[in-house]
């Protein structure tokens, strides 16, 4: 789209424009991301729960097919996943992705990377700013520093 007689400030740092991220995991959203997006960010019916790697891999096949059909290089489209970071909590049931020990979280990061995810957006928020800051520091020291 082009607009005339419009001023937009501040100008974006990225050239020629900021990357366009397309969200959603429906087929139309995946097709849109493949046709015009720089990054696909699947957001499903339960935004707090990321797609499992197997389902994400299936959707990436579709994304790549749509990109090729649109004449685009599928490798040029990045993939982002929101990764809610959970405290270990109750270990009697199945472990949620991005919860548990630092080793388990690192393995989750690697699993999503292996599927094709290029960006993970971690959610460190809690009701207490100090606790949020502590979670970020712990993640930085125990997960990022080793990954």
Regions found by a protein language model. Name each.
Residues 1-147:
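Active-site-adjacent structural elements that line small-molecule/cofactor binding pockets in enzymes
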């Amino acid at each position: 789209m082009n607009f005339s007689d419009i001023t937009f400030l501040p100008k974006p740092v990225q050239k020629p424009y900021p990357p366009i991220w397309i969200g959603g995991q429906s087929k139309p959203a995946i097709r849109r991301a493949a046709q015009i997006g720089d990054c696909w960010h699947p957001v499903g019916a339960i935004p707090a729960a990321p797609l499992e790697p197997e389902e994400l891999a299936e959707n990436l096949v579709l994304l790549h097919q749509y990109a090729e059909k649109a004449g685009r290089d599928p490798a040029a489209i990045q993939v982002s996943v929101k990764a809610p970071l959970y405290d270990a909590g109750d270990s009697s049931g199945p472990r949620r992705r991005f919860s548990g020990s630092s080793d388990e979280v690192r393995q989750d990061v690697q699993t999503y990377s292996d599927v094709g995810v290029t960006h993970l957006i971690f959610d460190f928020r809690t009701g207490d700013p100090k606790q949020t800051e502590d979670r970020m520091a712990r993640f930085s020291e125990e997960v990022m520093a080793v990954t």
